[in-house]
Amino acid sequence: MNMSRTRRLLVQSFIGITATTLWGTALAANTIRVGPTNAIKTIAMAAATARDGDVFEVESGDYRGDVAVWNKDNITLRAVGGRVRLLADGMAAEGKAIWVLQGARMTVEGFDFSGAQVPDRNGAGIRLEKGHLTVRNCTFTTNQNGILTADNPNAELEIVNSEFGYNGHGDGQSHNLYVGQIARLTVTGSYFHHAKVGHLLKSRAAVNDIRYNRLTDETGGTASYELEFPAGGVAYVVGNIIQQSSQTGNPHVISYGVEGYKWPKNALYLINNTLVDNRPNGGVFLRVSPGEVTVRAVNNLLVGRSKLDSAGPGDYRNNFNVDWDEFELAAREDYRLKRQSKLLGKAIDAGLVDGLSLMPDSEYRHPREVTRLKGKALHPGALQSFK
């Protein structure tokens, strides 16, 4: 056999193997339509028949009492034709949640979870028990917990462009978002508001990356903490609007390490946030429990009388207490600086951690979006753009 023919046969074999592999992958990743006009009419049926790698496209509409346990790996669920509204209507998978997730990896997009209530007061829109969950463009309202995770050191939760409001049983033990001792929590471009006595966001994760969000307990809000990291861990809190309601029963806006430091590395980086205290008698922007912890707070705007450095030892630089009139329309949560503000251009470099810059490269845009900055962040606070 001559060399050219040998080479040709090798190429043909490679093409055949590649095509077979791609075809097998395509077959494995089935795309399945779910809805009243399809063979699979309910989400519960979809979960019961799911195979690893399946993609479910769920037709828009109301799905009442349609609860499910998902235990397959690499599952994608996305709404098509509009929003998919999941109303618990007194039902809960395994007595826990509208959805209970037990697979290795799952992506959920375009769903509205509401009304999860169970006797133990921990009913959730989603209960994450293992694996990696990505939630994108979803809402969680009037549940006892919006999302609740188990304690699983290998689990990860990513939340993108989503909304959490009016969740909580009212006992202070259930929250808009309640994350246990997992490996990592990432939240970007999301809107948290009006938790019912509980917190807007509570996490015991080893790493918490909270960037470019709006966490504002607004008129009528009764949330406790806006952000709590009771077990410590590493928390990057960058470019967020964080507002405490006038009706809160808890003076603290952000709390860190109150249960003791449970992780090997404990550090809080509070960079370029706008922190607002509406409590009539004044609140406390930051509480940090004593221990082996790094605190760095740079370029934050503080609407209220409290100071960040009252939390204890740390690197506190370039944080400004400001009045309401620095902003375009603070009464409507528009915290863009006015064009004539004397704070413009006064941001400083917040430094690096593990070789990566702490400075924001994006900003939150309401509702539930993130916009990339055209240049570097020049101003203190969460928002760099103007009216």
Name the predicted role of every residue range:
Residues N2-S4:
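N-terminal hydrophobic targeting signals that begin at the initiator methionine
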Residues S13-I17:
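Sec-dependent N-terminal signal peptides
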Residues A19-M45, T49, S60-D62, E326-A330:
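Right-handed parallel beta-helix/beta-solenoid
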Residues A44, V55, E59-S60, R64-K387:
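Extracellular beta-rich repeat passengers
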Residues T6-V11:
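N-terminal export leaders
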